[in-house]
């Protein structure tokens, strides 16, 4: 599809056919209305060709419970964990139902929230998706250049991290659990700043008795030249 739009059902269908095996295909869909509709149509087309298809819908964003783009929460950077862990299960030779089950388990245990201090230019529109002053930040951003939930005055990095983690930790109970952490650049935020952010994430989690098993810092799911970041926490068990 074009930048920030879903691929068409025909394109998705061709992709399914290109990778299909006897075990079938798992579609990992981010929860945006157009994506869900097009992928489900493509899945039905593939099933008519006797290709076994299953799906999961990722909705890890704690910032919104509904928007112009979604019914329910959006799928954002936590989708990377779904891809990697479901992919590892598939690589073990697991059946499609098992891969789907593990993917859904990741979705149930991952939460994400992000913030931006500079928008990106949406190619089809030729202008930024939202406006920000020099002293403002956009809280609760998605991944398609769309605005977040609200604007706030720009704050120090540690305070921004505190705000994001408060929302994430209030959504599911991470107390006493091991987690994987992802600090993800929205596109233009340099690694040095991401590691400063991650340092405070680690401090906050340690204070709350949450053990970090592994940390990922970098550009995993970006929005062109947007300057900002998101934090994802995945609650782990032995399988994940």
Where are these regions (language model features)?
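Mixed-charge interfacial surface used for oligomerization/domain docking
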Residues: 64, 90-196
């Amino acid at each position: 599809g074009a930048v920030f739009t879903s691929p068409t059902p025909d394109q998705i269908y061709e992709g399914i056919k290109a990778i299909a095996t006897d075990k079938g295909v798992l579609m990992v869909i981010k929860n945006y209305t157009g994506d869900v509709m097009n992928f489900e149509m493509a899945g039905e087309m593939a099933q008519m060709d006797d290709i076994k298809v299953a799906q999961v819908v990722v909705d890890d964003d704690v910032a919104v419970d509904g928007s112009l783009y979604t019914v329910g929460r959006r799928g954002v950077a936590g989708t990377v964990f779904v891809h990697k862990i479901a992919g590892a299960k598939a690589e073990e030779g697991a059946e499609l139902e098992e891969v789907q089950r593990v993917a859904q388990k990741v979705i149930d245990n991952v939460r994400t929230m992000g913030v931006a201090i500079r928008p990106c230019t949406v190619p089809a529109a030729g202008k930024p998706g939202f406006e920000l002053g020099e002293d403002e930040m956009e809280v609760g951003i998605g991944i398609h250049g769309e605005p977040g939930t609200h604007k706030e005055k720009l704050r120090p990095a540690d305070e921004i991290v505190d705000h994001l983690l408060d929302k994430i930790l209030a959504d599911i109970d991470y107390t006493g659990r091991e987690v994987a952490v992802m600090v993800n650049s929205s596109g233009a935020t340099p690694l040095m700043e991401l590691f400063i952010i991650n340092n405070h994430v680690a401090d906050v989690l340690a204070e709350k008795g949450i053990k970090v098993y592994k940390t990922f810092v970098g550009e995993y799911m970006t929005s062109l030249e947007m300057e900002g970041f998101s934090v994802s926490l995945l609650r782990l068990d032995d399988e994940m």
